[in-house]
Swiss-Prot record:
Pfam families, per the entry: DsbB
Classification via InterPro entries: DiS_bond_form_DsbB/BdbC, Disulphide_bond_form_DsbB, DsbB, DsbB-like_sf
Key word Transcription present: no
Organism for this UniProt entry: Legionella pneumophila (strain Paris)
GO molecular function: electron transfer activity; protein-disulfide reductase activity
Gene: dsbB
Regions of this protein lying in the Cytoplasmic compartment: 1-9, 59-64, 159-163
Gene Ontology, cellular component aspect: plasma membrane
Protein name: Disulfide bond formation protein B
Record function comment: Required for disulfide bond formation in some periplasmic proteins. Acts by oxidizing the DsbA protein.
Its membrane topology: Multi-pass membrane protein
Family from the record: Belongs to the DsbB family.
Length: 163
């Protein structure tokens, strides 16, 4: 794969990622949706992906390592979005109990409780508060992370032969 092609692919992915970040902040601040712990973890994964894409635009020598890291972070984001989709599919009597906001969790609860909420979700993660074309927000996030994981894997195998 040529350097120019690699940079074009990474630039395209970075543009998509910036749009995802803008959409998440728009939905939070303009629409008024409060992100649940799993949403916050997905957002962290998106920011890490953007950082890795920015890093990859600066150097091409370690492109296969950066691409592998992109794949792993995208898989982590895919886990969080699929976990949230699973929580949303549960009947209301089987969904976990709602917890206070993350700021209250961090201030008053032990770190184990905060980590459990961030990695496993809480009752507010099971609520479907927004849909587009019948697909909830974690469904769209899962599609984004799946695309990024596929592209990361593709770039990993293709960048070992950069000229």
């Amino acid at each position: 794969m040529k350097k120019l092609t690699y940079r074009k692919i990474q630039s395209f992915q970075a543009i998509i990622t910036v749009l995802v970040i803008f959409a998440s902040f728009y939905l939070e601040y303009a629409v008024g949706l409060q992100p649940c712990p799993l949403c916050l973890m997905q957002r962290v994964c998106v920011f890490i992906l953007l950082g890795l894409m920015g890093l990859s635009l600066g150097t091409v020598k370690k492109a296969h390592i950066v691409s592998l890291m992109q794949f792993l972070v995208a898989c982590a984001g895919l886990y969080f979005s699929l976990r949230q989709l699973w929580l949303q599919s549960l009947p209301s009597d089987q969904a976990p109990a709602c917890m206070p906001g993350l700021d209250v969790l961090i201030q008053y609860f032990p770190w184990q409780t905060v980590a459990k909420a961030l990695f496993w979700g809480a009752g507010d993660c099971a609520e479907v508060t927004w849909t587009m074309f019948g697909i909830s927000m974690p469904g769209w996030a899962a599609m984004y992370f799946l695309f990024m994981a596929i592209m990361g894997l593709f770039l990993f195998f293709r960048t070992r032969t950069i000229n």
